[in-house]
Amino acid sequence: MSDYHLIIDGQKVATEETFAVLNPATEEVLAQCPKATAEQLDQAVAAARRAFPSWSVTADSERARLLHAIADALGAHGEELSKLLTLEQGKPMGGFAGLGAGFEMGGTLAWCHATAELGLPVEVVQDNDEARIEVHRKPLGVVGSITPWNYPLLIAIWHVMPALRSGNTVVIKPSEYTPLTTLRAVEIINELLPPGVLNIVTGDGSLGAAMSNHPDINKIVFTGSTPTGKKIRQSAAGNLKRITLELGGNDAAIVLPDTDVAAAAPKIFATALINNGQTCAALKRLYVHEDIYEE
């Protein structure tokens, strides 16, 4: 059983308490995960805040280079990360319709590379004899990321890479059900980034609540349930924290009269049961035109 640690200011940090992470296929204990305290969250946020002034003025080209390097480093550990993802989350390597751990790993690398190529150009909203008005998008500061268990690595990358690319520093808290792949990924990423730019703390929902209330976190990014998103919104309002909430969807499919039902049915089935149906984008409603309803 591997040892896992928090990563704060580029260093591995042990905790007094741990919690068990289970293999959902066998319900056996897969690992003991560090349980961060409120004080350790404060340390992680303080490290991110110390790193922010330097990281925020790092050349745009250098941040882009580092994101490409991160993708390469994660790719070099792709087999290890994919196996760990299967063990803690339960999805097989290939998965239903080919959308298993291997797909998530591939998406992780692609997202790193794609984000590296994004830019934040100056937007000119007025340029005439009266005035020239430009919009410059500047880094916010410390971003808190709270991620779910259904796509633990991919969604972590969705949160973290745009934040880093735009000059912010990050404290991430993965789901307590699937923290191991994210812990290992952050460890790998920290071999490339300056200390404090990316920190990770692990624990239960109380740690996420503390992040939402933390006065030195400038923005919260959360993917998860609508009830939890409502709580985060309420907490963040207390200190005018910016938020991005990706909550549960209610996706629909529409089958029109001229549809080739035999061809469409397997795709509809796959869309409903991708990742065992445990995804915000899974098909939940199906509308079929009355002319082909019986078919």
Predicted regions and their residues:
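Periplasmic-binding protein-like
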Residues: M161, K219-T223
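Conserved small-residue-rich beta-alpha loop and adjacent elements
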Residues: V124-P194
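Residue-level signal for inorganic ion chemistry
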Residues: E27, R63, L85, G167, ...
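Short beta->alpha connector loops at strand-helix junctions that form conserved
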Residues: N168, K173-S175, T202, T223, ...
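Active-site pre-lysine segment of PLP-dependent enzymes
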Residues: T182-E191, G205-H214, P227-G238, I254-D258
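A structured beta-alpha segment of the ubiquitous adenosine-cofactor-binding alpha/beta core
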Residues: R132-I133, I200-N218
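ALDH superfamily catalytic-core signature
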Residues: P227-E295
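N-terminal Rossmann-like NAD(P)+-binding subdomain of aldehyde/semialdehyde dehydrogenases
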Residues: M1-A131
